[in-house]
């Protein structure tokens, strides 16, 4: 059986609000949609942190557990937990094989965490990952720049995923949006 992957995750800080959205499609290889309603965005650490994954499903669950453990260990300090997780992820021979990326955020900070040791905080309060990530990122930036006074963070996140779903074959319209 092939690898299960492909998705789009989008996160935004906007006017004091934060939201993260993910689609529900799980694709096996490049040909078969195996699931339409996967939940790839979750609340962690007593509902104070949002995390979303793109990549291999089994790997992502491992990373969710690992990140939540780091959040507990560092008492909810998002940046410290992300840096320590990235160091462990990059430094461990087995963990380096994991094929996934995470976006993690709380009310003040948003970070992209990857297995190559990257922990990146965006300048503009927007991140997107996955196969439709560039489409969602473009849509989100345009919405935030030109319609920001009329839209909430949740509305920007949902609309960005809808636009990505219209373009990317690995992204569907079963969108889950979580807010803090």
Curated annotation (Swiss-Prot):
GO terms for cellular component: HslUV protease complex; proteasome core complex. SUPFAM superfamilies: N-terminal nucleophile aminohydrolases (Ntn hydrolases) (SSF56235). It is an enzyme of class 3 (hydrolase). It catalyses: ATP-dependent cleavage of peptide bonds with broad specificity. Na(+) binds at residues 165, 168, 171. Protease subunit of a proteasome-like degradation complex believed to be a general protein degrading machinery. The keyword Metal-binding applies. The active site is at 7. It is found in: Cytoplasm. Allosterically activated by HslU binding. InterPro entries: ATP-dep_Prtase_HsIV_su, Ntn_hydrolases_N, Proteasome_sua/b, Proteasome_suB-type. One of its GO terms (molecular function) is threonine-type endopeptidase activity. It comes from the Bacteria. Keywords: Allosteric enzyme, Cytoplasm, Hydrolase, Metal-binding, Protease, Sodium, Threonine protease. A double ring-shaped homohexamer of HslV is capped on each side by a ring-shaped HslU homohexamer. The assembly of the HslU/HslV complex is dependent on binding of ATP. This is ATP-dependent protease subunit HslV. It holds the Pfam family Proteasome. Its EC number is 3.4.25.2. Belongs to the peptidase T1B family. HslV subfamily. Transmembrane segments: none annotated. One of its GO terms (biological process) is proteolysis involved in protein catabolic process.
């Amino acid at each position: 059986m092939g690898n299960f992957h492909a998705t789009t995750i989008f996160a935004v800080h906007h006017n004091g609000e934060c939201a993260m959205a993910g689609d529900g499609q799980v694709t096996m290889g490049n040909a078969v949609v195996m699931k339409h309603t996967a939940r790839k965005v979750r609340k962690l650490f007593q509902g104070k942190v949002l995390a979303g994954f793109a990549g291999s499903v089994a790997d992502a669950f491992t990373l969710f557990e690992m990140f939540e453990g780091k959040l507990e260990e560092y008492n909810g300090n998002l940046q410290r937990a992300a840096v320590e997780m990235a160091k462990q992820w990059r430094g461990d021979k087995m963990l380096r094989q994991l094929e996934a990326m995470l976006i993690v955020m709380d009310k003040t900070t948003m970070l992209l965490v990857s297995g190559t040791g990257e922990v990146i905080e965006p300048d503009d309060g927007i991140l997107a990952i996955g196969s439709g990530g560039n489409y969602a990122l473009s849509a989100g930036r345009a919405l935030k720049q030109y319609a920001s006074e009329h839209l909430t963070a949740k509305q920007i996140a949902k609309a960005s995923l809808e636009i990505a779903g219209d373009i990317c074959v690995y992204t569907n319209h079963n969108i889950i949006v979580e807010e803090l």
